Each structure stands twice: as C-alpha cells, then as structure tokens.
Amino acid sequence: MCSVSELLDMENFQGDLTDVVRGIGGHVLSPETPPSNIWPLPLSHPTPSPSDLNINPFGDPFVSMDDPLLQELNSITNSGYFSTVGDNNNNIHNNNGFLVPKVFEEDHIKSQCSIFPRIRISHSNIIHDSSPCNSPAMSAHVVAAAAAASPRGIINVDTNSPRNCLLVDGTTFSSQIQISSPRNLGLKRRKSQAKKVVCIPAPAAMNSRSSGEVVPSDLWAWRKYGQKPIKGSPFPRGYYRCSSSKGCSARKQVERSRTDPNMLVITYTSEHNHPWPIQRNALAGSTRSSTSSSSNPNPSKPSTANVNSSSIGSQNTIYLPSSTTPPPTLSSSAIKDERGDDMELENVDDDDDNQIAPYRPELHDHQHQPDDFFADLEELEGDSLSMLLSHGCGGDGKDKTTASDGISNFFGWSGDNNYNNYDDQDSRSL
C-alpha cells in the first residue's frame, strides 16, 4: 500500500531523470530525513586511486582514460541546472522538499582532456578544438603526424593558445591544424601556358592585291596549319607552328589589329626547346616565298622558258581519273602531321564560335584537262606525193611530161630550163 505522502510526492514529479532515479530508489525525502543519508549512491566498485590510474600493466593506452559521456554529464551538473548537496534549506523547501544532488563525484575526473576531441570546422578549412588545455610538450610530434597524414595540407601548430588536448602515452599536447584543399587540377593545360603578345607594323604586300595576313620574318621557321575568321574584322587570323624541330611546342597567331589595320598582332605561345635554326632552315614556310621573290625581281627570258617547260612537264605528269596507273601515295608521317594539325586547330581556345577552315592550296583550272581534248582534230589524208604519182608512169610521152611538170612545179623547179640544158649537152657531145 502506498502512503499518502508517497502519493503527494508522485504528483510533484516533473518527468525527468531525477524522478526515475527517485522512483527506483524508493527514497522519499522529508524535512526530518538528513540529505547525507541518501546521496551519493553506493558504487558497485571502489574508486581507484590516482596512482593506480597511471599504472599500465598491459601496455594499453586507454586504461587511464575516462568516458567522454561521463565528462559531458559532469559539465551539465556543474552548470547549475541541477541543485547540489550544498544548497540552502530555503531552496529545498521551495522545491517541495526534494533534493537533486550531484550525480558524479569529482574524484572520478582525472583531467579535462579526452581522447575524443570536440572539433569545430569553419568555412576557411581551419579545424578548431573547443576544450581548454595547453601543453606544448609534443607540438613537434603533431607536425610530423599531421604531415604524414595529409601531404598536401598546410599544418600550423599554436602552442600559446588553449586548444583541445590529445592524450598520447600519458602526455598531452595541443595543436591547431589547418588543412588547405588542393587546387583544382581540371583546368586546361592551354590556360597555364604563357602567352606573349607583340604588335608590329604590317609590312607591305608583295602583290597589288593586299591580303589580310602578311607574316614578317622573325628568324624562326614557321608552318601555317590553319586560319580562322574573326568577328568584327575583315581579316582572318592565321595559326602557325614551329617547323624547325619536330617536337617543338611553340605556336603563334597572326592577325590584323581591329583598331589599326596597319598593325599586326602576333601572339606567341610556349617557348622553343631548340637553338636558333640556320639561315637556310629559317627561310622555310612563309618566309621563303617573300625572300625568293625579293631576291629575283626581274626574271630573264630563259628562266621564263624554264618555268614554262617545267609547268608543261608537270601537266604531263598529272594523273587523270581515267588513267590506270595509281598516283603516288603520301608517306604515313605526312598524313599523321596533317591529322595532328587538324586536331590542334579544333582545340584552339578562342572566344569566337566560327568554324575554323583548314588551309588547303587551290588547284587551277588548267590542271584539269578534259578527255575530249583531241576530239575536234581530224585525221590527215593520204600523202600528197602519192596523189601526184597516181596518174601512172606508162603511156605516151605527153603524160610523162605532164607528170614531171607537176613534180617540178611541186618542188619549185622550172621544167623548160632543165630540158634546154639537156639539149645543149647532147649537141656538144655530137
């Protein structure tokens, strides 16, 4: 049977952990009951002494460590949320005669350090710890351990400010670790290449019709592998690569300035990985045509004849579609170079959205000869001499005379003079 006092006490329960402990213990506080007879609760095992806590017989570093959950509960009791044994009697009567003592004694707490640190991570990738402790004895070990854990991180150790404590072999040390996130490695390689822009006056065009791209000589051998139209400019942009060395990654772009068309804007990308070429190799590519034309401004007639004969010979060697002999095939290295240039031209990093047209030389119309070139020509008839001699050599002398007269007239001989000479010779012989 429950007494009346117990029923009155149950009405004053607040439904917290203290009411559960009070109900299990069955202790009802009254003004006559001294508080020291109730709390603290008897422990199931004796409290070890501080000297026993430092003993580590089996080499286990977790023997002398406390439970972090118990430490959290102890901090709650220290905050004043629960009343303790040392409260005044006025507070006891105001709380309907009940006493909520301290749950855990301070003898169980060795220090405020814990193996489980409380970490606060900020947006600046700095890891802060919130428990107050300062022991700079093992700061060097912190740097070595953190550097081995994160080789890309930046580690800063602050031994002057109180930080969270980590227990290693019975000693404590504090640290502040700052880990920087690695840089974004997904950027394009072309972005990291250094570019150099040079503005020079555009040289005069060699022919009367000025084109948008006149490349000056810069003592390097360049080869053009493409061009691209520019928005807002009537002149295209040319793309060149170094042809002095096969593995050279040097590139340049040549275009007219949008503000001043008389200026050329040359953008150099990457550096040459080879020495300066000799003068003969430097004339390769776009420079060779300009120097050759300037060195021989007035060609003579024999050179023109040689050019005509060479052009005729080249026309004779053109392989028509109807011919049975296949044309000579290109080498595999030349094909690979052309494919590499096309792929590189497609990967050019530029803001324009126009399509890049690869550079290809145009074929002239005279090189394509039709098959019916000799169709309008007629075959020659029989020989004219056979026609003249077809009258026959037999018959009277009159026919022979007319035939001989026809032959003499054909070769421009006079028949009368010949006959007169023959008569004179006969008379002299007689």
From Swiss-Prot:
Its main location: nucleus. Residues 340-354 have a biased composition (Acidic residues). This is Probable WRKY transcription factor 14. The keyword Nucleus applies. Residues 283-366 are annotated as: Disordered. PANTHER family: WRKY TRANSCRIPTION FACTOR 14-RELATED, WRKY TRANSCRIPTION FACTOR 30-RELATED-RELATED. Residues 211-277 bind DNA. One of its GO terms (molecular function) is DNA-binding transcription factor activity. Residues 307-319 have a biased composition (Polar residues). It is found in: Nucleus. Keywords: DNA-binding, Nucleus, Transcription, Transcription regulation. InterPro entries: WRKY_dom, WRKY_dom_sf, WRKY_plant. GO terms for cellular component: nucleus. Transcription factor. Interacts specifically with the W box (5'-(T)TGAC[CT]-3'), a frequently occurring elicitor-responsive cis-acting element. It comes from the Eukaryota.
